[in-house]
Regions:
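Generic helix N-cap/helix-start motif at coil->alpha-helix transitions
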Residues: 29-37, 64-71, 97-106, 128-139, ...
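Residue-level recognition of tetratricopeptide repeat
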Residues: 42, 76, 110, 142, ...
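Conserved structural position within tetratricopeptide repeats
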Residues: 59-62, 93-96, 130, 161-162, ...
Length: 583
């Protein structure tokens, strides 16, 4: 049973069950008393600067506390910073003025769930402002369970499951409800698809199934499920769970302990399902509330932080990641995320310090060493990066296709340190693991051309990379530059012009275009492109060479470099950043 995200079509069907993410209905807006604060709050909200927006809305509300427009904006801003309790108070005031919005509805729902006021939740679902049948159906079922009526709860989950496109959501939550009530046999029937419907479980769903099997004294089956799902993943939490199952330890069911947890799981389930499909702010709304109701659900914390990163709110994202404590199995994942968002905020040294500290506490985790290597490589500390990558490689055992980026990244470092033999070995290993990986094909092929070796193999590699990524400018540039370096100037022209269209403000690509124009006799155009390249602020070595070409022409520069090789004569390949795979 592989871990999967919802299929795009299924997610589109899910989205169709949600109405517009805008307010369904608000009270008649009135002119705010502090117009300056109101306008500034609106601007901050539009920029997703939730913290600034909260302060500005507070200021505006201090002079006009009965303004529904201000209240509704403040609700959303407070949810953005994670203050659900304050958002709920604002929501009560907003609805007292006749206002209705999804954020007010969800904030009030969250506080009632946290307080265990399930009767109020059942009453509240009658006033849905447009959240949708899926959310309300699941929440009502959990609230019925919280009220002590299992029959109505199960009927509610069944009603959701009977809705076209929602069967898996209804069945999954029904299984969780049964397990939370101690009916592990009933939960296992659903998880095992004994009634014909195979659920597609995410990581948390698989762990719930594992716990159910363990409670049924079926640890060997639980281990088999883990092997099938996670393979040889070295994640500490998975390793520890395997150890406990192997020792015969009964694993308690704690994914959902009560109805409040169940409602938290509704927010988490829908937030995860909508991630990447709905607007980021909308996903954040669900993730923040899931995190509020279940602070120990690290998946909800990570989902929250991910949305904040997407919105460019790196300080808030770092705070979210920082909420996961060192004793949590997801701590190392959170710290890697905190380092990434810290780096994105421009604090590169602080990001490296986070990773170095993590390597001291979790140095036996492959993903940690890989992340440290990546961070050091990006800051051009290549020798230190290689040490981290070496440590990661030593942990691999038998490498598989998911490890290609580790060898690719180490190869880049070796190349930058002029250790070409080691670099080539790493690149070839990356291709052995992932033969059609365009980033590796591009880098290795370009490097061969740059050195004047293995030219036929090099051109074939680059052509395969272009076939896989025809609209990636740097890879198309590699093809053109390879043809240029092989003296096939006319053939280089078309891909070089395409690369320039794809990367119109890149100094290296523009410089290359000038060289190709010069070589096919279009010297005025070459001069123009070289001057453009200078305007894009290339590094100093490239800038010096471009200025020399403008002064004496490309032929003279090449003649000089051929007579006395210099570092400036070497064309460089711009590596495409390997995808982060967490391995």
């Amino acid at each position: 049973m592989p871990i999967q995200k919802p299929r795009p079509l299924a997610t589109l069907a899910l989205l169709a069950l949600f109405t517009s993410q805008a307010n369904a209905e608000t009270a008649r807006p009135t002119e705010p008393g502090d117009a300056g604060a109101y306008l500034a709050a609106q601007y901050a909200s539009a920029e997703n600067d939730f913290r600034a927006a909260v302060g500005l809305y507070d200021r505006a509300l201090a002079t006009d506390g009965q303004n529904a427009t201000l209240l509704d904006g403040a609700i959303l801003a407070n949810i953005g910073i994670g203050d659900i309790a304050k958002a709920a108070k604002l929501a009560v005031a907003f609805e007292a003025l006749g206002g209705k919005s999804q954020q007010s509805y969800l904030a009030i729902m969250a506080e009632r769930a946290k307080a265990g006021d399930f009767a109020a939740i059942l009453e509240n679902t009658k006033n849905d402002p447009g959240v949708g049948a899926l959310f309300n159906g699941l929440v009502k079922a959990w609230a019925e369970l919280g009220n002590g009526d299992m029959t109505k709860a199960l009927a509610g989950f069944d009603a959701v499951a009977a809705t076209p496109g929602l069967e898996s959501f209804g069945l999954f939550h029904k299984a969780l409800a049964l397990a939370s009530a101690g009916d592990f046999e009933g939960a296992e029937v659903i998880f095992s698809a004994k009634k014909g419907t195979q659920l597609t479980l995410d990581r948390r769903g698989v762990l719930a199934f594992v716990q159910v099997l363990s409670q049924l004294e079926r640890n060997p089956d639980a281990l088999s499920l883990m092997d099938k799902t996670f393979g040889q993943v070295t994640e500490p939490a998975i390793v520890d769970l395997r150890r406990r199952l192997t020792a015969g330890e009964p694993i308690p069911f704690d994914v959902v302990r009560n109805s409040t947890d169940g409602i938290a799981e509704v927010f988490s389930t829908l937030g995860s399902a909508l991630n990447g499909q709905a607007e980021t702010n909308y996903v954040l709304l669900y993730a923040r509330i899931a995190n509020h109701l279940r602070p120990d659900n690290s998946d909800a914390v990570l989902l929250t932080a991910e949305q904040l990163e997407k919105l460019g709110q790196h300080d808030l994202a770092a705070e979210a990641y920082g909420a996961i404590t060192p004793d949590d199995p997801s701590y190392y994942v959170a710290e890697i995320g905190r380092a990434a968002t810290t780096r994105a905020a421009g604090r590169k040294e602080a990001a490296i310090e986070i990773l170095q500290a993590l390597a001291r506490s979790h140095g036996d985790v492959l993903a940690v060493q890989n992340a440290l290597g990546d961070g050091l490589r990006r800051d051009e500390h290549f020798a230190e990066a290689i040490k981290a990558y070496d440590t990661a490689v030593a942990m691999l055992g038998t490498p598989n296709s998911s490890h290609w980026s580790l060898f690719y990244s180490r190869g880049i470092c070796n190349d930058q340190l002029k250790n070409w033999d080691l670099a080539e070995s790493d690149f070839r290993m990356a291709l052995k693991l992932e033969p059609d990986q365009p980033q590796v094909l591009n880098y290795l092929g370009y490097s061969f051309v740059d050195r004047g070796i293995n030219l036929d193999e090099a051109l074939g590699m680059i052509e395969r990379a272009v076939a896989a990524r025809p609209d990636e400018g740097f890879i198309v540039d590699s093809l053109a530059w390879a043809l240029f370096r092989m003296g096939r100037f006319d053939e280089a022209l078309a891909p070089m012009e395409k690369a320039s269209l794809l990367e119109p403000v890149d100094a290296v690509v523009t410089d290359h275009l000038g060289d190709v124009y010069w070589s096919v006799g279009r010297k005025r155009e070459a001069d123009f492109q070289w001057r453009r390249a200078l305007s894009f602020e290339p590094d100093e070595a490239d800038a010096t060479r471009i200025r020399h070409k403008l002064a004496v022409g490309l032929d003279a520069v090449i003649a000089e470099e051929t007579a006395v090789p210099t570092p400036a004569a070497e064309a460089t390949v711009a590596p495409v950043e390997p995808a982060t795979d967490g391995n």
